Swiss-Prot record:
Motif mapping: 'HIGH' region: 122-132
Quaternary structure (record): Monomer.
Localization annotation: Cytoplasm
Main location: cytoplasm
GO biological process: arginyl-tRNA aminoacylation
Record keywords: Aminoacyl-tRNA synthetase, ATP-binding, Cytoplasm, Ligase, Nucleotide-binding, Protein biosynthesis
HAMAP family listed in its UniProt record: Arg_tRNA_synth
EC number, as in UniProt: 6.1.1.19
GO CC list: cytoplasm
Family of the protein in this entry: Belongs to the class-I aminoacyl-tRNA synthetase family.
Catalysed conversion reaction: tRNA(Arg) + L-arginine + ATP = L-arginyl-tRNA(Arg) + AMP + diphosphate
Name this protein carries in UniProt: Arginine--tRNA ligase
Length: 577
């Protein structure tokens, strides 16, 4: 149950009944401090201002008609007109019981929508690097959350699998194949192959001529060029899949929807935009001038959709892509997890899409932009030599560091167990360090911080789960077979239950805002509150058996909530560390 939404609805009804216009926001939020209750309604002052009345007097009118029977034990007016709401212990205990008995921990499924999520999007014939990490793991965490809420999510890995660079790559692939008879499906160093192709293109005019011819042939559907192109895509995606699997990212080959998918749509898009009077010829090119965007002279900005040589641009592809996602995939909502530097480009493409009538206004197009990963020097994260860090190398280093950490903490574990724990901790640390930061901000990549067992880190959260789970090992009981009822005898118990029951609010916020850090913050706060509860409220040596069973239930709900929350982030838990 989303308690915040329930109270918000009740307060909204009361505000309207007290004389405010329908739809006046109640602005119910979680209280910052326990002295202000569990929730606080902040919309009273805005409503009073609209009505031209005293806020505290209006707050009293709202309280007179507010029905929170069976939910709140107390309500009070605070400050200039806030309403503080204190949840009743009976309500909290009953909701905690219901959550523990539910495989979904009380999280309701939403009315299902079809949601397309565009994330990861590496380029063909290039290895994934750290710049792909944020889109890949942020997108995947949001996708998992949306699916948990019952939505149909279509993963779209919009890989860069088309363009003039494929001429030189195919020409080089052909050269290698002629020399060795067959190209290894490994092509272990894609970057080296790409650099070699570029060098040949720049230095060998005959090679460059062949490459240019292959671009034309590929665009014309030449069977040989298509076969070579497909081989390059296959080699790249096999390597990318290894990174996805290591990171526990849910993308597969079936989710690839590359730029090439939309090639056949592009001529028709241009023709249609011309017919609708949106695209006009300008210096031989087809251009859409947008009043919504101005150039430095204050004139409508021109967006080229077809070059004078007949070639199409990324914008043309993005228009076709958005159209396809609505018309063919039936999207109600489309999420783009793309670098913040692409914002204007996307906004221009979407403006054209709306003007052309390809997607109605009730379909949401959302750019979930993200900042950069920085080194300790505050600059983009690079190798010591100043090069781009390959994602596979980053994951290898994470594994080595985690292995050394586990070795130092638990040398008595078997080699197999150490390796398993190190791998789980390493991938979790890399992901959580990113996911725990606000998506739109840059963040500093710091090995020491991300592998620390203190603070808002993956090792801390994984250990928090292990610690809670160990209670049941010590008790010799299964957390799924507990008896008795949850009861509240201490403030720390009430605080823990109140936080546990905010899980659905965190889940829905991540789904709505595309911000996984909300879940990280929630889980970190929950772990801290459980720690306070654990120290203040003895579980296994509780003074009464009924209290022991109640506290075991609270520990079980905490363990399940942490495990489920981390699973939505694509992070595994461990039974022991």
């Amino acid at each position: 149950m989303n308690i915040q939404a329930l109270i918000n609805d009740r307060v909204s009804q009361a505000i309207e009944a007290a004389g405010a216009p329908a739809g006046t926001p109640a602005l119910v939020r979680q209280s910052a401090k326990a002295q202000f209750g569990d929730y606080q309604a902040n919309g009273i002052m805005g409503a009073a201002k609209q009505l031209g009345t005293n806020p505290r007097e209006f707050a009293q009118k709202v309280l007179d008609v507010l029905n929170l029977e069976g939910i709140a034990s107390k309500t009070e007016i605070a400050g200039p007109g806030f309403i503080n709401i204190f949840l009743s212990e009976e309500f909290l205990a009953a909701q905690a019981e219901a959550a523990l008995a539910d495989a979904r921990l009380g999280v309701a499924q939403e009315a299902p929508k079809t949601i397309v999520a565009d994330y990861s999007a590496p380029n063909v014939a290039k290895e994934m690097h750290v710049g792909h990490l944020r889109s890949t793991i942020i997108g995947d965490a949001v996708v998992r959350t949306l699916e948990f809420l019952g939505h149909k999510v279509i993963r779209a890995n919009h890989i860069g699998d088309w363009g003039t660079q494929f001429g030189m790559l195919i020409a080089n692939l052909e050269r290698v194949q002629k020399a060795s008879g067959e190209v290894s499906m490994e092509l272990s160093d894609l970057e080296a192959f790409y650099r070699e192709s570029k060098k040949l293109y720049d230095e060998d005019e005959q090679f460059a001529e062949t490459a240019r011819n292959y671009v034309v042939k590929l665009q014309g559907g030449d069977p040989f060029c298509l076969e070579m192109w497909k081989k390059l895509v296959d080699v790249t995606m096999i390597q990318n899949q290894r990174n996805y699997d290591r990171l526990n990212v849910s993308l597969t080959r079936e989710n690839v929807m590359g730029e090439s998918m939309y090639n056949d749509m592009l001529p028709q898009i241009v023709s249609d935009l011309k017919a609708k009077g949106l695209a006009v010829e300008d210096d031989g090119a087809q251009v859409v001038f947008l009043e919504e965007f101005k150039n430095k002279d204050g004139e409508p900005m021109g967006v080229i959709i077809q070059k004078r040589d007949g070639g199409f641009l990324y914008t043309t592809t993005d228009i076709a892509c958005a159209k396809y996602r609505y018309e063919t995939l039936g999207a109600d909502r489309v999420l783009y997890f793309i670098d913040s530097r692409q914002h204007q480009h996307l906004m221009q493409a979407w403006t054209i899409v709306r003007k052309a009538g390809y997607i109605p206004e009730n379909v949401s197009l959302e750019h979930h932009a993200f900042g950069m990963m920085l080194g300790k020097d505050g600059r983009p994260f690079k190798t010591r030599a100043g090069g781009t860090v390959r994602l596979a190398d980053l994951l290898d280093e994470a594994q080595e560091r985690a292995k050394a950490l586990i070795e130092s903490k638990n040398p008595e574990l078997s080699a197999e167990e150490k390796a398993n724990i190190a791998n789980t901790v390493a991938m979790a640390a890399v992901k959580y360090a990113d996911l725990s930061k606000h998506r739109t901000t840059d963040y500093v990549f710091d090995w020491d911080n991300m592998l620390a067992f203190e603070g808002n880190t993956a090792p801390y959260m994984q250990y928090a789960y292990t610690r809670v789970a160990s209670v049941f090992a010590k008790a010799g009981v299964d957390m799924n077979e507990l008896t008795g009822h949850i009861q509240i005898t201490e403030e720390k118990e009430k605080a823990l239950i109140a936080k546990l029951l905010q899980f659905e609010e965190a889940v829905q916020s991540v789904a709505r805002e595309g911000q996984p850090h909300i879940m990280c913050s929630y889980l970190f706060e929950l772990a801290g509150i459980f720690s306070s509860f654990y120290e203040a409220c003895p579980i296994l040596v509780a003074e009464q058996e009924s209290i022991k069973q109640s506290r075991l239930k609270l520990a079980a709900l905490t363990a399940k909530t942490i495990k489920q929350g981390l699973a939505l982030l694509g992070i595994d838990t461990l039974e022991r560390m």
